[in-house]
Amino acid sequence: RQVNAGALAQLTEREREVAGLAAYGMSNHEIAEYLVISPATAKTHISRAMVKLGARDRAQLVALAYQHRLVDPPDPTSPTAP
């Protein structure tokens, strides 16, 4: 799914951050602990990012985060790679 540049520009810094953390596999609770915010706030940021990017679910948000380089893909040569 393509997202126009305007939609990407609408994301706040925090929405980009939580989308990236979700892409790294973190739950809302883990994101909240990492950013020292409440789980409800983490969920709100995820939801708003999904709406702005037109993602129908968290999996699509993660795919869009990688596709539009909100996060870098994991390094397959890393010792922590699956």
Place the predicted regions along the sequence by residue.
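A cross-family signal for key residues in well-ordered alpha-helices
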Residues: 20, 33, 63
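Short amphipathic helical patch at the helix-1/turn junction of helix-turn-helix
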Residues: 21-23, 40, 66
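Regulatory hinge/linker segments at domain boundaries
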Residues: 1-21, 72-81
